[in-house]
């Protein structure tokens, strides 16, 4: 029977496919335009089942136990009706076998009419009315057939659920076919697998698989066929009527429901995303329940149509059935908004008719259920949007559709809410569709949910025709996938061809869908520039925000407290503000794809957005929605407007409405992204509300979620108009608001002078207080102003002395006044110096012109001889001038002695001649004079302190006149005679040069001196030549030229200066050098000394040279000496040359002497050296020593061949890690520092511990390390710890004498002779006497350690017990290291043993002090001495912790006398 049924079903299917192939092609086009909600939701929602059922489902609540019992009773009644219907259908079963084959595939095909002409006529009518009903009917047929196939398995699930009214009927089915329920489960499982694969090949395989399993189902399907035959007969009569009636109520319901859904969507957008995942999990279970309820409701209504009692109920149920069909068609025709409106209208009407037989409590449940279902469906719309971006995944979408249907049809029980395994889902799917007996109460939740799904999908789809075209493809594919598993019984050629054609069409659709451009209605904001963002009204008008109670800086001053106390007026203003802000936000943040959607959505949304909170509250509170659908929507809009003021009356309700509006406006800014979060939160709220009484305001539940969301809102952009009366009675709030208003009246800006300071708290500006840095800078600027040397200023003076007005110009020196105002140290002195310099130079020029006119000839002759040399050094001369700045004071002093100054000038000229051999002698003298004058003028300012310093030196030189004169006589006797030859013309020329040089003079005279010294052009063989650089200073020192009295002296002196002092003239002038160098033979030692300490001795030399010239030259010499300090090397070379010349002059001294010298390998060699050579060696000694000390690095191998070449080594190529090296060096350094710190800490500890001992603050216990082992000092103190306590022996010397006496007495009593210690003591004494022996050196090192470590008090070591007891209080611990050698020698002797052991056998010493603190040596009995003798000897001969042996054996010490190092030193 089952096989025949399968064959007939396949045949019927093939015929249907042949007839409807063109219809399906049309469907495909429509499906391309409409992707179903399931497609996009990922199988979590239904495919577009009936809108009327969704409408009813929206008003239903989860079943309570009472409802379940009631529905079971109803199901029993309906089972009787079904039995009757089955009896009728059995009669017609044979006639309808072909018809039955399609039923497993499409349940509604029987109801609507796939093979019936009447139903086809009805379909045609609905096609004419709705435009695309054939597509829907075919889709519905596939769904119905699937549901019929899945009916047998559904019974198990509904039994567990105890929710369904058809339990009894299923029980019969289970008894008849106990094994048939398991197989359909497998079949459904396979079907789901095929859907997962989403490939037509798998569908064909599944068809073959079903062919084997169909025989088990056919028996069940026969009963169902009979039932459905009856249902068909009944519905054929009423189908056309229903279809005629449908359009108008549908449109009405559509309008009302559309408005409801829009308002709900707007309200639910406010909710957060917290419950989104939870709702997505819950959604399939809800949909299962609703689907099953829907199907059972349909079947029960059809069967009750057979009963005469329920005949009246049959028509509404059939209407609902047809409405479902029509609404399915409308769902795929979402592109047509007008028909959507009709569909919603009919949904509402069908809901009203179906729920006339139900209680008001069920109606309230429906309301809540409806809201939850619509929330889910809104979430579904979001998922649609997400999955629209994945067109290539159509196969998965088909699988998801199947899953969603199966999940929707599984009844929702508390235990099964979480079960989502595919087997259970598919089993529930089969069961839900095998039970047509479920009550109408269960139909309504499904209707509601599906209606919400349709609406939520329709909103984006209405706006996006392309998207809807894409969405239509998915329902078609799902229908095909449903058809294939059912029809694959006996596949004919025509059926196969039709399948292949359908697959080709489907693949083409998928290809087109993949390639199609889909406008995803996600929030894709338009790209905005920063200027556009910043030019928004909410940003540009922060003042209005603050005035209205919002905070421009919400992070600093949140205004929540003000919002809680909003008055009604404020609330209205706030609502208006929020509306404006929402409009602005929606316009600004509108996505690019939204521009087209706006026009359609405006037509379909009859209510304004501001009313959405009211709509939500009304729908939650109003139980009459199913009965008055049309009026409800209108009432909702009206009540929404009224509800805002009502909320405003209550303080807590204020915030509810306020925040609800805030949420609305903000969700409008993000219309799509927020739907899922809003739906999630709404659904959670509805779950809470469902079990609460209606008295509780649902908006308060919203408040919880809204308050959670509020911190995320940008409250700074909310513009709220200021309230007419204070927002809160609290004064602090008013004050704070006033402050904010005041602060916001002005746009923040910084104004004012740069010297002003702005108080950021008050905004006041005040003058900046000058800081210490500013004061310092001001003072510095004043000093800089003072340096503007306004020497003179011309002032016009008008006088009327002689009766007429006369104007006289007077130049006033303002510099003195400035100095008086801002006194600078030495400024007045410097000015006086400058003034005096000018006077002196003028006077000198006059005197020189007079006096030198007579001496001009003689000077010309003398200086012609040195002219060549002068010209050579001319460039060096001028820097020299710049250097010698400071001797003006002396010149002022020297002004008195004109003759002495003449001599000084002459000598200056000589020195200049030495330094500048290329200059004419006349020019040199003039240069000297002019240099002195110019330096007086120019260098007075920069070097006042140096002048004073030089002045002091000059005075000192005057004191030493006698000794200096003697030295100068030796060196420069002819100097005074050189002054005469200088002529006035020469002086004038030098003066001009001086003024030219003046510009080059700076305060950096020392640098110029250094350059002169390093120039290497100064004569280096004589004292004078070494001082020659400073001759410039002498020239500059402005010696009065009137002092050139002795011309003969000047000539001799000039000859002496020029006689070979220059290195360049050594060969030519050697003969003239000879006599002078003989005189200067005594000088070399002094020269060497000068080289060593250039400053001081150079000063003395200068004084010596200056003396014959009278004080003038002495000034110049100090300057010269400063230069000498830089030229040690040159001086040494000069001295060498000097010595050479002296040796030439003194051949008598050249008798060689033999000396022992060392070569580079330190081999001794005998060297013969004359006195001159020794002097040269002595002169060069410093340089050689410097080389040894690596100041001039050299090696012994330098002289060898090729040793200066660089040999490449492998180590040169190594590249070291700098960080690693740095780290290692740091570690080494840290260890060294740590060791040093430890040593220092130990020293400090020792010092502190010693001090604390006396006060008994710290008890220090010095014990013998091992009392039995023998003698070992355990003194923790370091050697340096007691270095400051060296006064102990001196303080307690009388005590030591007493102790020493007692010790000697004790030794005599014991029979120990002090002579025993004599060998050691004598050896120590001998070594101390041998000052050169290395042995002494060692003992000296030891003694130095001992001397550094001293003790405050000397402890009495070797005394009798009685004496030790007496001296315990005064005795202080100590170490042997502290004792002097005499004491140690005695102690060493005492430790050698008793009278029996005089032969230096050593005994041990043990401590027997009363306190461990006391460091006392006690005497031993003879027994103890004998027992410990050997150990003590070992320990005493070993070194202690300090590394010092207390006893040195005498046999080692004689060797120390043989060391040679000490003899050499």
UniProtKB/Swiss-Prot annotation:
Which InterPro entries does the entry link to? Claspin (IPR024146)
Specify residue ranges for compositional bias: Basic and acidic residues: 121-133, 205-216, 229-246, 254-263, 273-286, 296-335, 358-373, 400-417, 845-859
Instruction: Please give the chief subcellular localization of this protein.
Output: nucleus
> Which stretches are transmembrane?
none
Coiled-coil residues? 260-281, 564-587, 839-874
Tissue range of expression? Answer: Detected in the ovary but not in the testis (at protein level).
Which keywords has UniProt assigned to this entry? Cell cycle, Coiled coil, Nucleus, Phosphoprotein
Instruction: Provide ranges: composition bias, Acidic residues.
Output: 375-388, 432-441, 456-470, 594-606, 860-875, 913-942, 960-969, 1094-1103, 1127-1154
The record describes the protein's role as: Required for checkpoint signaling in response to DNA replication stress; either resulting from normal embryogenesis or induced by the DNA synthesis inhibitor hydroxyurea (HU). It is not required for the G2 arrest resulting from DNA double strand breaks induced by ionizing irradiation (IR). Necessary for the timely phosphorylation of Cdk1 at the mid-blastula transition. May have a minor role in maintaining genomic stability in mitotic cells.
Protein name in the entry: Claspin
Corresponding gene?
Answer: Claspin
């Amino acid at each position: 029977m089952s096989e025949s049924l399968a064959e007939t079903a396949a045949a019927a299917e093939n015929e249907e496919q042949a007839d409807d192939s063109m219809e399906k092609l049309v469907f495909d086009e429509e499906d391309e335009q409409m992707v179903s909600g399931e497609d996009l939701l990922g199988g979590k929602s239904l495919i577009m089942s009936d809108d009327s059922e969704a409408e009813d489902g929206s008003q239903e609540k989860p079943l309570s136990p009472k409802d379940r019992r009631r529905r079971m009773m109803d199901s029993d009644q309906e089972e009787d009706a079904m039995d009757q219907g089955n009896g009728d259908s059995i009669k017609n079963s044979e006639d309808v076998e072909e018809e039955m084959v399609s039923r497993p595939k499409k349940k509604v095909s029987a109801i609507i009419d796939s093979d019936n002409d009447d139903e086809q006529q009805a379909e045609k009518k609905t096609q004419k009315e709705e435009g695309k009903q054939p597509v829907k009917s075919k889709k519905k047929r596939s769904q119905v057939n699937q549901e019929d196939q899945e009916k047998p398995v559904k019974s198990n699930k509904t039994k567990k659920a105890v929710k369904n009214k058809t339990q009894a009927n299923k029980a019969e089915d289970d008894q008849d076919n106990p094994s048939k329920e398991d197989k359909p489960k497998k079949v459904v499982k396979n079907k789901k697998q095929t859907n997962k694969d989403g490939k037509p090949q798998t569908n064909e395989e599944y068809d073959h698989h079903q062919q084997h399993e169909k025989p088990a189902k056919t028996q069940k399907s026969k009963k169902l066929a009979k039932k459905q035959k009856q249902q068909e007969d009944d519905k054929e009569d009423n189908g056309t009527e229903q279809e005629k009636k449908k359009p108008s109520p549908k449109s009405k319901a559509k309008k009302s429901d559309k408005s409801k859904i829009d308002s709900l969507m707007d309200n639910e957008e406010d909710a957060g995303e917290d419950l989104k995942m939870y709702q997505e999990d819950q959604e399939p279970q809800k949909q299962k329940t609703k689907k099953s309820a829907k199907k059972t409701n349909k079947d029960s209504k059809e069967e009750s149509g057979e009963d005469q009692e329920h005949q009246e109920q049959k028509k509404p149920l059939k209407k609902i059935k047809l409405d479902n069909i029509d609404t399915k068609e409308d769902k795929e025709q979402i592109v047509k908004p007008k028909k959507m409106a009709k569909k919603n209208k009919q949904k509402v009407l069908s809901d009203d008719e179906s729920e006339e037989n139900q209680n008001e409590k069920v109606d309230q449940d429906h309301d809540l259920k409806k809201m939850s279902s619509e929330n889910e469906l809104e979430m579904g719309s979001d998922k649609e949007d997400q999955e629209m971006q994945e067109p290539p995944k159509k196969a998965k979408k088909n699988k998801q559709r199947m899953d969603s249907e199966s999940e929707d049809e599984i009844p929702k029980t508390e235990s099964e809410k979480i079960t989502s395994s595919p087997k259970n889902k598919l089993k529930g799917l089969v069961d839900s569709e095998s039970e047509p007996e479920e009550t109408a109460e269960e139909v309504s939740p499904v209707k509601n949910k599906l209606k919400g799904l349709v609406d939520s999908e329709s909103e984006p789809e209405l706006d996006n025709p392309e998207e809807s075209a894409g969405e239509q493809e998915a329902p078609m594919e799902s229908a095909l996938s449903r058809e294939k598993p059912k029809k694959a019984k006996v596949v004919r050629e025509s059926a196969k061809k039709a399948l292949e054609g359908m697959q080709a069409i489907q693949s083409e659709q998928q290809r087109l869908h993949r390639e199609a451009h889909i406008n995803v209605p996600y929030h894709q904001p338009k790209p905005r520039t920063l200027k556009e963002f910043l030019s928004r009204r909410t940003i540009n008008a922060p003042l209005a925000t603050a005035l209205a109670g919002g905070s421009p800086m919400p992070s600093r001053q949140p205004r929540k407290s003000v919002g809680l106390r909003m008055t009604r007026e404020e609330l209205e203003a706030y609502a208006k503000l929020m509306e404006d802000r929402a409009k602005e936000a929606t316009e600004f943040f509108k996505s690019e794809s939204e521009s087209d959607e706006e026009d359609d959505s405006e037509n379909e949304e009859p209510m304004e957005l501001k009313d959405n909170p009211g709509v939500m509250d009304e729908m939650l509170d109003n139980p009459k929605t199913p009965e008055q659908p049309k009026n409800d929507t209108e009432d909702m809009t009206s009540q929404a407007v009224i509800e805002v003021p009502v909320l405003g009356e209550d303080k807590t309700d204020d915030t509810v409405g306020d925040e609800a509006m805030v949420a609305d406006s903000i969700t409008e800014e993000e219309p799509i992204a927020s739907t899922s979060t809003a739906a999630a939160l709404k659904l959670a709220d509805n779950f809470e509300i469902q079990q609460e009484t209606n008295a509780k305001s649902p908006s308060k539940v919203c408040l919880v979620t809204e308050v959670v969301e509020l911190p995320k809102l940008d409250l700074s952009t909310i513009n709220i108009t200021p309230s007419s009366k204070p927002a809160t009675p609290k004064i602090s709030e008013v004050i704070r608001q006033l402050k904010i208003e005041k602060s916001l009246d002005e746009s923040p800006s910084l104004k004012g002078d740069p010297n002003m300071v702005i108080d950021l708290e008050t905004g006041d500006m005040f003058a900046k207080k000058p800081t210490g840095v500013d004061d310092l800078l001001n003072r510095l600027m004043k000093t800089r102003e003072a340096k503007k040397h306004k020497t003179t200023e011309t002032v016009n003076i008008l006088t009327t002395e002689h009766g007429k007005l006369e104007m006289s110009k007077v130049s006033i020196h303002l510099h003195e006044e400035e100095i008086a105002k801002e006194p600078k140290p030495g400024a007045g002195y410097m000015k006086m110096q400058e003034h005096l310099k000018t006077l002196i130079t003028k006077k000198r020029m006059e005197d020189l012109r007079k006096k030198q006119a007579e001496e001009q000839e003689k000077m010309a002759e003398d200086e012609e001889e040195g002219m060549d040399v002068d010209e050579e050094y001319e460039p060096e001369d001028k820097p020299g001038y710049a250097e010698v700045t400071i001797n003006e004071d002396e010149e002022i002093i020297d002004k008195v002695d004109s003759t002495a100054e003449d001599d000084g000038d002459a000598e200056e000229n000589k020195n200049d001649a030495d330094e500048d051999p290329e200059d004419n002698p006349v020019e040199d003298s003039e240069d000297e004079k002019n240099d002195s004058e110019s330096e007086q003028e120019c260098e007075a300012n920069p070097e006042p302190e140096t002048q004073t310093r030089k002045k002091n030196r000059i005075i000192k030189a005057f004191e030493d006149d006698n000794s200096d004169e003697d030295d100068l006589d030796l060196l420069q006797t002819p100097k005074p005679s050189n002054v005469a030859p200088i002529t006035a013309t020469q002086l004038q020329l030098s003066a001009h040069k001086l003024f030219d040089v003046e510009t080059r003079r700076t305060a950096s005279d020392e640098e110029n001196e250094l350059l002169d010294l390093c120039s290497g052009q100064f004569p280096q063989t004589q004292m004078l030549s070494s001082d020659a650089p400073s001759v410039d200073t002498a020239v500059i020192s402005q010696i009065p030229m009137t002092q050139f009295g002795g011309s003969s002296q000047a000539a001799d002196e000039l000859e002496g200066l020029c006689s070979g002092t220059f290195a360049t003239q050594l060969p030519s002038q050697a003969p003239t050098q000879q006599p002078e160098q003989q005189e200067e033979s005594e000088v070399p030692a002094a020269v060497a000394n000068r080289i060593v300490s250039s400053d001081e001795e150079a000063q003395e030399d200068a004084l010596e040279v200056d003396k014959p010239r009278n004080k003038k030259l002495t000034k110049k010499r100090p300057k010269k000496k400063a230069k000498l300090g830089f030229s040690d090397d040159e001086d040494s070379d000069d001295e060498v040359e000097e010595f050479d010349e002296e040796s030439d002059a003194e051949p008598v001294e050249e008798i060689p002497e033999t000396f022992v010298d060392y070569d580079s390998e330190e081999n001794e060699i005998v060297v013969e050296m004359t006195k001159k050579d020794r002097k040269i060696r002595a002169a060069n000694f410093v340089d050689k020593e410097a080389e040894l000390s690596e100041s001039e690095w050299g090696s012994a191998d330098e002289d060898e061949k090729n040793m200066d070449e660089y040999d490449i080594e492998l180590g040169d190529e190594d590249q070291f890690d700098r960080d690693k090296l740095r780290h290692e060096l740091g570690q080494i350094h840290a260890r060294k520092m740590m060791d040093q710190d430890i040593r220092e800490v130990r020293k400090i500890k020792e010092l502190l511990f010693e001090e604390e001992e006396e006060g008994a603050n710290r008890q220090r216990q010095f014990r013998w390390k091992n009392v039995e082992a023998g003698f070992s000092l355990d003194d923790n103190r370091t050697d340096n710890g007691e270095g400051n306590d060296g006064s102990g022996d001196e303080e307690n010397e009388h005590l030591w004498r007493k102790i020493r006496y007692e010790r000697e007495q004790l030794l005599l009593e014991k029979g120990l002779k002090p002579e025993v210690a004599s060998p050691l003591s004598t050896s120590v004494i001998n070594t101390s006497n041998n000052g050169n022996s290395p042995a002494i050196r060692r003992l000296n090192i030891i003694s130095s350690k001992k001397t550094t470590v001293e003790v405050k008090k000397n402890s009495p070591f070797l005394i009798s017990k009685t004496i030790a007891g007496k001296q315990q209080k005064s005795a202080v611990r100590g170490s042997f290291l502290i004792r002097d050698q005499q004491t140690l020698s005695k102690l060493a002797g005492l430790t050698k043993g008793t009278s029996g052991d005089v032969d230096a056998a050593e005994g041990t010493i043990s401590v027997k002090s009363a306190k461990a603190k006391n460091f006392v040596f006690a005497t031993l009995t003879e027994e103890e001495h004998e027992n410990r003798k050997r150990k003590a000897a070992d320990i005493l001969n070993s070194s202690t912790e300090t590394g010092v042996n207390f006893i040195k054996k005498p046999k080692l010490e004689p060797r120390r006398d043989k060391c040679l190092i000490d003899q050499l030193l």
